[in-house]
C-alpha cells in the first residue's frame, strides 16, 4: 500500500516539477541575451527573424551532438535563423571545442556569471529556445529534438 501511495504521489508531483523546470512560456517574451563577451568577438550583427538560444556545457556529450545538428539546420535555413550558444564556461576552456562551430549564423555568448542561465532557469542541457524577432518563445526543449520542419512550423 505504501508503494502505491508513494508512486501516486510521485506521479502527481512530476508534472508540477516539469512545469517549473524552465522559466519561460511559449508565446511570452523571454529574457534578453545580454552578455559582456562573445567568443572571438562574434556578437550577432543584426537580429534575424528567428534566433535559437542554445544552452551548452562541455561536460555533456549531447551538447556537442546538438551543435552538429544545429550547424546542419543553419546550413539548410541560412539567414532565416541565427543560433546563439550560451555557455557558463570560460573562453580558454571552450574556445577549442566551440570555435569550429562559429559562422555567420552561429555565435557563442560567454555567460561566465551565469546570469542568462539563471534568467531562463535552465535545469538541464542541451536545452534551447526558439525566439522570434519580438523576443517571444516559439518552441523550447531538448535541442536534439529540433528540426528544420519544427522551426518552419513554429515561425508561421
Describe the residue ranges of each PLM region.
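Thiol-/selenol-based redox modules, centered on thioredoxin-like
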Residues: 130-156
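Short, internal strand/loop/helix patches
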Residues: 84, 100-129
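Positively charged n-region of N-terminal signal peptides that target proteins for export
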Residues: 1-4
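Bacterial N-terminal signal peptides
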Residues: 7-15
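N-proximal helix/coil linker or "cap" segments that precede and/or mark the start of modular domains
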Residues: 15-32
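Structural microenvironment flanking redox-active thiols in thiol-disulfide oxidoreductases
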Residues: 64-101, 116-118
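Short pre-active-site segment immediately N-terminal to redox-active cysteine/selenocysteine motifs
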Residues: 49-51, 56-60, 124
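A short beta-strand-turn-helix
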Residues: 29-51, 68
Amino acid at each position: 500500500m505504501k508503494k502505491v501511495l508513494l508512486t501516486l504521489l510521485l506521479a502527481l508531483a512530476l508534472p508540477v516539477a516539469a512545469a517549473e523546470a524552465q522559466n519561460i512560456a511559449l508565446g511570452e517574451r523571454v529574457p534578453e541575451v545580454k552578455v559582456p563577451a562573445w567568443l572571438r568577438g562574434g556578437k550577432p550583427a543584426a537580429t534575424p527573424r528567428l534566433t535559437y538560444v542554445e544552452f551548452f556545457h562541455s561536460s555533456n556529450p549531447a551538447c556537442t551532438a546538438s551543435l552538429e545538428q544545429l550547424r546542419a539546420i543553419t546550413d539548410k535555413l541560412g539567414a532565416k535563423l541565427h543560433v546563439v550558444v550560451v555557455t557558463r564556461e570560460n573562453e580558454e576552456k571552450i574556445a577549442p571545442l566551440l570555435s569550429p562551430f562559429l559562422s555567420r549564423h552561429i555565435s557563442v555568448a560567454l555567460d561566465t556569471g551565469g546570469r542568462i542561465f539563471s534568467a531562463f532557469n535552465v535545469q538541464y542541457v542541451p536545452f534551447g529556445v526558439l525566439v522570434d524577432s519580438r523576443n517571444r518563445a516559439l518552441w523550447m526543449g531538448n535541442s536534439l529534438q529540433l528540426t528544420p520542419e519544427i522551426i518552419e512550423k513554429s515561425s508561421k
